[in-house]
């Protein structure tokens, strides 16, 4: 598995706990608060210092972007999103896109390309993953 140190300890501990719960007849549900998506296509955005840092969405007052590359919400109140001021808007990345600032874009692209991210509106991010583990009868 290529695990070392604390990762191996956590994996072994989790396995031990799940095995013990199974032996005692317990059903276990494992879940997350959201899913993720692998991102590989950068979309350049410009914003001021107050613009959010998330890679899958941005909110702020002075966002500059190509509107064909993002899903934009110009009136957050229309979709019940919070607004920090009267001129705030939101943009969301499509598919496997991720949003990077124009300044230092190449460094961010190298760092974040092919990573798993969340915060967008794709099915993969909005569906909550879970698994139900039942003991053998």
Language-model segments: which ranges?
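Active-site neighborhoods of enzymes that stabilize oxyanions during catalysis
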Residues: 39, 44-137
